[in-house]
Amino acid sequence: MGQNLSVTNPLGFFPEHQLDPLFRANTNNPDWDFNPNKDTWPEATKVGVGAFGPGFTPPHGGLLGWSPQAQGVTTILPAVPPPASTNRQSGRRPTPISPPLRDTHPQAMQWNSTVFHQALQDPRVRGLYFPAGGSSSGTVSPVPTTASPISSTFLKTGDPALNMESISSGFLGPLLVLQAGFFLLTKILTIPQSLDSWWTSLNFLGGAPVCPGQNSQSLTSNHSPTSCPPICPGYRWMCLRRFIIFLFILLLCLIFLLVLLDYRGMLPVCPLLPGTTTTSVGPCRTCTISAPGTSLFPSCCCTKPSDGNCTCIPIPPSWAFAKFLWGWASVRFSWLNLLVPFVQWFAGLSPTVWLSVIWMIWYWGPSLYNILSPFIPLLPIFFCLWAYI
């Protein structure tokens, strides 16, 4: 045990590996231990901690056998080197020569120059090789080879590389437009609810608007009149209010579109006198262009008389459109003519009155802002229409 680096005697074995005489092990067979590796063990009388805990590692050829590992001797064997590569010994072999084309593709050898020229006599085949307006003769001049043998042999041209910048920009633009449109749509959908809240608040001055009807959660609880459930009696009135609000928004958009088209000159209208179908009489002049050939942005309204020339009225298109609407409305609603003196008086007011009006607007501005704030999401749409139409 001189070379055993294990622990001291854990189970009480004697130095010569004989069991304790208390168990009568040495009476009949004093040499019962046939371990050939017996040696003097000075530390046999010491009790220590075994390799697997206190008193669990017998020395030498005990419970673990006679192997070198059981006796605490560890043998380190050198690593076996990998076998030498056969490729390095024999070297790289050359690539075998490809067999000739007549052996691998015999069908290609049947398509020679004679057959090719005969096939070119067919107009359908000729159209594949000659563009429109090209040579109509039956002979084909060979195209000189400009590619070098090295480049044609080793350079394989596949699909062209994709331009990721153009692809990303092509996707980014519609994505931003979709995101902006979705944002504006969510804001526009809040307009009817905001106007509905303002409308219902007029009936509850000084208090919170509450609908005394029933809802699906509780038959007696109150709720906002702008969020009535279908079983509530106020649900039909809420739908009616929002329908009127939608019509008002559509009318507002239509008026803006008509004013924009008229400002761009795409809606040439002429002011009509009440009850007449002819243009108004005023400081007119004879144009040198015909009526169908009017410019895109006319500066006056034109009619086409019998001589082929147009008589222009020097009125800006927007004023002409406003006058046309006023004439159309005054013919059908005669009481609007009573407002003409008031409008003329209001237009001739002194600067003091205008300052008073400005002060009133400044005083009532916050409340007007609360009323007009739902229409703010419509401003970007109007601006885009104004810029691109």
Swiss-Prot record:
Q: Where is the lipid attached (N-myristoyl glycine)?
A: G2
* Cellular component terms (Gene Ontology): membrane; viral envelope; virion membrane
Residues of the region (Disordered) are 78-105
User: Which Pfam families does the UniProt record give?
Assistant: vMSA
Q: Hey, which stretches end up on the Intravirion side?
A: 2-242, 192-242, 359-364
Virion surface compartment segments = 2-170, 264-337, 388-389
UniProt-annotated stretches for the region Pre-S2 = 109-163
Specify the glycosylation sites in chain numbering: N309
Subcellular localization, per the record?
A: Virion membrane
In UniProt terms, what function does this protein have? Answer: The large envelope protein exists in two topological conformations, one which is termed 'external' or Le-HBsAg and the other 'internal' or Li-HBsAg. In its external conformation the protein attaches the virus to cell receptors and thereby initiating infection. This interaction determines the species specificity and liver tropism. This attachment induces virion internalization predominantly through caveolin-mediated endocytosis. The large envelope protein also assures fusion between virion membrane and endosomal membrane.
The protein's name is Large envelope protein
Source organism: Orangutan hepatitis B virus (isolate Somad) (HBVoru)
